[in-house]
């Protein structure tokens, strides 16, 4: 096995294992809530959709800073790696506080944006208030996990995630259904379990970054210092990624808004379909993270030919992995949907939707690895932002809104419209990749 393969596997396998278990446990959690009926599914799904905006925005912070972490990792500059993390955490926590305020103080208004069903809103309010506290925990955990993966310590976040996910699943089982001495709390129990699992994850990461045994060590004192020159350089490339992920997540939330306004049934279909579809993306996280680390570190070392060679290999690997994943999602979707307590119409609609999204997996994953893993690694963050925002907001969102709300077409037709933007992205994205404009060193600018 050559050095490239060893590096890919050392990064991709732990992340893939983490994603497999995460998707599996999230499915179990979803099924537990699903056994309470379609209204709790809709309520939890809508709150989680708002949390999704924060998650993707935090991913934007992590991904934007990861461009520099990867290139600094190439030359083993740990001081600047830690400096990058400490500065991006300031941005992340500012955003987290804003999301906390909305979820805790204005849950009814937030849910009312998506749904007019009073029962859905009523069920979702206590869930939103409890999970609001996780915003202050997960942002830190997310940044540290991403940084550890970027310095090729992917096993650490895998183990931490397994502890947190296991904690969450057991907590859900005990508190949703009231097992043994625990009270039966339903959706509120799910929220408490989520909060406790995120707290456990946060505390583990705090221990890791304050311990001398691990490669990334953060200082509380340095967290309150600010290097304006360094920050400007970081945000020059990171800010387009943050804006990109925020607007992309807002676009995905707009899709959910359209489905919710179509009917409660439509939002239940979207929630279940998304949970199943996530199984298809179990390889994506590993491949895209490995792409960022390996291509980015070679750019940091100014090994441009090697970076280009590795980028091409990652695209080839993505096509193979995505084809297998898409087929697997289609084949096993019937087994998964049978675990849900839903009627025949929802069941059949979800199965049709899964065929659509499964067939689209190769093109979606290819776009993801190219944009997130390759173009951003070389600082092409403004182009990536333009490509994603234009394709989503000028193609995807208008199509979904018109077909779903104006013409009131079937759910499956509206779902097809969510895929159309990917065609536009792959044409322009691959053209940019072939131009080689992404091949540049950022840390020595």
Which residue stretches match the model-derived regions?
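N-terminal transmembrane alpha-helices
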Residues: 3-31, 35-36, 52-64, 68, ...
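Transmembrane helical elements of multi-pass membrane transporters/channels
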Residues: 10-29, 130, 164, 197-201, ...
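Residue-level hotspots within pore-lining transmembrane alpha-helices
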Residues: 17, 21, 25, 54, ...
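Small-residue-rich hydrophobic transmembrane alpha-helices
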Residues: 41-105, 138-157, 256, 267-333, ...
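Short runs within selected transmembrane alpha-helices of multi-pass transporters and secretion channels
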Residues: 62, 131-150, 157-168, 190-205, ...
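Structural signal for membrane-spanning alpha-helices in multi-pass inner-membrane proteins
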Residues: 103, 146, 172, 176, ...
């Amino acid at each position: 096995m050559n050095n490239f393969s060893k590096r890919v596997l050392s990064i991709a396998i732990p992340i893939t294992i983490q994603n497999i278990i995460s998707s599996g446990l999230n499915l179990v959690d979803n099924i537990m809530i699903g056994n309470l009926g379609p209204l709790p599914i809709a309520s939890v799904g809508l709150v989680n959709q708002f949390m999704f905006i924060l998650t993707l925005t935090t991913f934007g912070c992590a991904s934007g800073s990861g461009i520099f972490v990867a290139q600094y990792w190439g030359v083993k500059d740990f001081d600047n790696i830690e400096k990058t993390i400490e500065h991006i955490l300031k941005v992340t926590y500012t955003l987290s506080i804003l999301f906390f305020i909305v979820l805790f103080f204005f849950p009814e208004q937030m849910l009312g944006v998506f749904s007019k069903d009073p029962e859905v809103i009523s069920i979702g309010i206590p869930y939103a208030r409890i999970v609001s506290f996780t915003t202050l925990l997960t942002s830190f955990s997310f940044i540290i996990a991403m940084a550890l993966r970027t310095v090729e310590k992917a096993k650490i976040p895998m183990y931490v995630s397994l502890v947190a996910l296991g904690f969450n699943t057991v907590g859900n089982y005990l508190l949703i259904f009231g097992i043994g001495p625990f009270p039966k709390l339903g959706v509120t129990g799910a929220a408490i379990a989520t909060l406790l699992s995120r707290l456990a994850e946060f505390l583990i990461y705090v221990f890791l970054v304050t311990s001398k045994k691990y490669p990334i060590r953060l200082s509380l004192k340095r967290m309150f210092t600010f290097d304006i020159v360094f920050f400007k350089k970081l945000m020059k490339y990171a800010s387009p990624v943050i804006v990109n992920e925020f607007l992309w997540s807002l676009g995905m939330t707009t899709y959910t808004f359209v489905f919710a306004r179509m009917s409660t049934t439509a939002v239940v279909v979207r929630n279940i379909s998304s949970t199943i579809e996530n199984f298809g993306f179990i390889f994506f996280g590993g491949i895209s993270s490995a792409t960022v680390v390996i291509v980015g570190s070679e750019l940091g070392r100014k090994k441009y030919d090697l970076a280009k060679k590795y980028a091409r290999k990652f695209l080839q690997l993505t096509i193979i992995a995505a084809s297998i994943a898409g087929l697997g999602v289609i084949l096993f979707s019937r087994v998964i949907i049978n675990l849900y307590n839903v009627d025949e119409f929802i069941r059949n609609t979800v199965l049709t939707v899964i065929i659509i999204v499964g067939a689209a997996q190769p093109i979606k994953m290819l776009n993801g690895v190219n944009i997130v893993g390759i173009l951003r690694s070389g600082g092409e963050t403004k182009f990536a932002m333009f490509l994603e925002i234009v394709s989503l907001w000028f193609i995807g969102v208008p199509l979904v809104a018109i077909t779903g709300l104006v013409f009131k077409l079937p759910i499956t037709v509206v779902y097809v419209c969510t895929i159309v933007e990917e065609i536009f992205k792959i044409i322009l994205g691959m053209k940019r990749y072939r131009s080689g404009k992404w091949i540049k060193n950022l840390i020595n600018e």
